[in-house]
Amino acid sequence: MRLIATAILGMSVCAFAQFSGRTGRVGGRVTFDDGGQTGGRCLVPGSGGGEEDIRKLDKVDGNGFVYARLRYHLQPWWWQETREVPWHHDYPDGDTMFPASLQRLTTVQATPESFQLVDIDSKELFLYPFLYMSEPGYLNLLPGDLKNLRDYLDRGGFLLMDDFRGNESDNSQFVNMKQQMMKLFPDRELKPLPANHPIFHLFYDVEPHDMLPPYRMFNSGEPQFFGITDAKGNVQVMIDFNNDISEYWQALDVGQCSIHEAGTAVQLGVNYAIYAMTH
């Protein structure tokens, strides 16, 4: 039954991908505030992108779900490991598919355009119930970022950190992410989330550890899920390590992933969004 349900979900998400307005990544060369540069498309993880696909909504509709992708400050060594600016990975294809899945599979009011690109130190954060951060292994939280992000999270906001890989004990990406979270919440512990945690069963019943890592050719470990919680035990920061659910989202309509992994990624995204709006 589980295989049948997964197959049905996979067919559903592939069907709604056709109307979601998927925008292909375009080539180009972009200079960012930190002086880093990124070139055009390249078929390796964390590459490609261009200035043409950076866009802003005319306004934020307060009656529907709109979430924000974070543009954050980077560690100075980021360019040694990836050609694309890390916060940009899977943008905007994954961002389009995420709200499209909410529109198709739930009663949440959303459209494929229900996302925004927001700077981490901007007060615009407080307009959105849900933040998405790509490749947090390269994150560098400055003093202004720390205050803004902590205020946002302590007022009930939710942050999903996704798309980084390696070994938990000696991987620079995981170690750096953990150091940044200790700066953000020195009084709170980053803990593994068990498979029976409510966030995995809120809307869909998901077996989170029954996923293949998206970058197996790079000898990444198995997918792991961590969380930082508030005093009431609510997850404020959700961390998908050795996983990349946005990569699975954007691959839904191009046949580059299995139905099981794509379906599970969609289910996780739906659960995360509903959790963010109800906790």
PLM regions with names:
Residues 9-17:
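Hydrophobic h-region of N-terminal signal peptides that target proteins for export
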Residues 63-65, 126-130, 155-158, 188, ...:
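Loop/turn elements at helix/coil->beta-strand transitions in domains of secreted/extracellular proteins
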Residues 108-118, 161-165, 187-196:
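Surface-exposed patches in mature extracellular/periplasmic domains of secreted proteins
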Residues 22-30, 37, 47-49, 75-79, ...:
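An acidic, glycine-rich "communication" segment
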